[in-house]
Amino acid sequence: MAAEGSTQQRRRVMAAASAASTSGAGRCRLSKIGASRRPPPARVRVAVRLRPFVDGTAGASDPPCVRGMDSCSLEIANWRNHQETLKYQFDAFYGERSTQQDIYAGSVQPILRHLLEGQNASVLAYGPTGAGKTHTMLGSPEQPGVIPRALMDLLQLTREEGAEGRPWALSVTMSYLEIYQEKVLDLLDPASGDLVIREDCRGNILIPGLTQKPITSFADFERHFLPASRNRTVGATRLNQRSSRSHAVLLVKVDQRERLAPFRQREGKLYLIDLAGSEDNRRTGNKGLRLKESGAINTSLFVLGKVVDALNQGLPRVPYRDSKLTRLLQDSLGGSAHSILIANIAPERCFYLDTVSALNFAARSKEVINRPFTNESLQPHVLGPVKLSQKELLGPPEAKRARGPEEEEIGSPEPMAAPASASQKLSPLQKLSSMDPAMLERLLSLDRLLASQGSQGAPLLSTPKRERMVLMKTVEEKDLEIERLKTKQKELEAKMLAQKAEEKENHCPTMLRPLSHRTVTVAKPLKKAVVMPLQLIQEQAASPNAEIHILKNKGRKRKLESLDALEPEEKAEDCWELQISPELLAHGRQKILDLLNEGSARDLRSLQRIGPKKAQLIVGWRELHGPFSQVEDLERVEGITGKQMESFLKANILGLAAGQRCGPS
């Protein structure tokens, strides 16, 4: 018995410990929810469609180069080794006998349900030109494609989920655009011109100015879509008589608004994309405009391949911005959408290289990981009246302190007006007349409950009316007194400033006149001063018979005026100039000429601006032509220009004239 009791006791202790650990783990999970939880990954699903042979194409009678193995795999001949085949595995493979309904029901229809959960989805048709992408997306009246089937089912789902009595109200809008030569054009409004692609603060891709048409039925969709489809750019090439020259994108938005509290709002987007096909211009024979269009198409598809490779390799930079197409597909590839890629291929052997390229791109694309999440938020206009009602619960003094200065200037009702009743004060529905009737009825019932409970707990509303009026009057008197004090303070400050200005004028009589009363005079250009060497000045001063006046005073232009009347520009003018006597200049020139005719190469290098090479040139010229007759003959020496001659004279003539040693040593 004792053993059984101890066993039961141990079991109870273990159970309690297990429960405690479980509850602790639960609390830990609850505390981290929303902060560390990431949306589950969703891989890009890839389906391959093989179109049948087209009559009139080259090689239509040859056996196909692609063969399906089962519903998910296919094989194609290896061009490097004809004895082998290349095998590919995808999420779905649709052969030549597959119908439009098979492709839609097997790959596209399952993702439409995510739109009603506030998530994004996208369907892309990829492949070379003439492989059947547009037929897959649009189809024909007898065999409608993915776009009409998806819109028909989506509108049916929104009607069922948004019916009366259901918790959500749904609305659907559509936009249709094309990317033609790196320009985003609105097909619903062709006159709008090139549009820009933006990204909001939450990372959502949007196009400002893009037309949005509300649709409630498939007839509404056809009324907008069919005329817009005729605006898409198409052209004829050797391989395709109606080749798409642009990427077409149909954007369908599903907005959901909750009818009851907490009044959530969801938005789901569906991208239906018909990509233009890659082209080999050697086979299509494109020239002129067609060649330019083909270059833009191939460039954007090349960037699309770079984006897929960057996502698969985990590179830090994904080149979404290198092309308008990849910028628009940022949600679809590596973003927040459930994506389906339908790769269209052709069976003819002339399309072999294009088919291999499309299959390789599809194989890389199925490795891309997206992280879809629900785009959900609360309606902002529901929270506004509640905040207003909290201010209204306060009395006039408290409310006045709670309001900012801007609200005080805009103003509220007159303070002396009769206060409203308690039910009007507590009502948060004073500005909700434009709301949904069902939502308004629900909030009215909540308002009545709030009014019945709030009248018991609001101390200000229980205050007698006479006391409130006296209190409001006191507050007004204090406000008026504050305004009077502010006005008086401003007057005193103005008087103090005026007194300081007068004191400055009295203590500074020599102050310059204000700029508005000064007359501006342009200073005359200063005369150049010729500077004499100091050694020469001393020699001339020491000579008793010196009659050379080095400095000649030109005299004052006018007598100095008083300091008050003298302008700064006039003070700056100097009336002295320096001149050199012509005898000194002639003496210096003669010394230079003697040195040129009699000096050796070493002596010539003692002159300024004369180096070893020029000294040798001067000696050689002197031996051939004889002595120099004047200093200017130095310009005749080969290698000495006129400018060099001028700089030579300026550098040497004054020093030599002053008696510096320049003769042969």
UniProtKB/Swiss-Prot annotation:
Phosphoserine: modified positions: 412, 427, 452, 543, 562, 581
Gene name for this UniProt entry: KIF22
Coiled coil ranges: 465-508
Main function: Kinesin family member that is involved in spindle formation and the movements of chromosomes during mitosis and meiosis. Binds to microtubules and to DNA. Plays a role in congression of laterally attached chromosomes in NDC80-depleted cells.
Annotated SUPFAM superfamilies: P-loop containing nucleoside triphosphate hydrolases, RuvA domain 2-like
Kinesin motor domain sequence ranges: 43-368
Post-translational modification: Ubiquitinated; mediated by SIAH1 and leading to its subsequent proteasomal degradation.
GO cellular component: chromatin; cytosol; microtubule; microtubule associated complex; mitotic spindle; nuclear speck
Protein name, entry field: Kinesin-like protein KIF22
Subcellular location: Nucleus; Cytoplasm, Cytoskeleton
Keyword flag Amino-acid biosynthesis: no
GO molecular function: ATP binding; DNA binding; microtubule binding; microtubule motor activity
Species per Swiss-Prot/TrEMBL record: Pongo abelii (Sumatran orangutan)
Chain segments carrying region Disordered: 1-20, 393-424
Entry similarity comment: Belongs to the TRAFAC class myosin-kinesin ATPase superfamily. Kinesin family.
UniProt biased composition (Low complexity): 412-424
Chain residue numbers at which the record places covalent cross-link Glycyl lysine isopeptide (Lys-Gly) (interchain with G-Cter in SUMO2): 465
Superkingdom as given in the UniProt entry: Eukaryota
Record GO biological process: DNA repair; metaphase chromosome alignment; microtubule-based movement; mitotic metaphase chromosome alignment; mitotic spindle organization; sister chromatid cohesion; spindle elongation
Lineage: Eukaryota, Metazoa, Chordata, Craniata, Vertebrata
Pfam families named in the record: HHH_3, Kinesin
Subunit field text: Interacts with FAM83D and SIAH1.
The UniProt record lists the keyword Mitochondrion: no
Keywords of this entry: ATP-binding, Coiled coil, Cytoplasm, Cytoskeleton, DNA-binding, Isopeptide bond, Microtubule, Motor protein, Nucleotide-binding, Nucleus, Phosphoprotein, Ubl conjugation
Residues at which ATP binds: 127-134
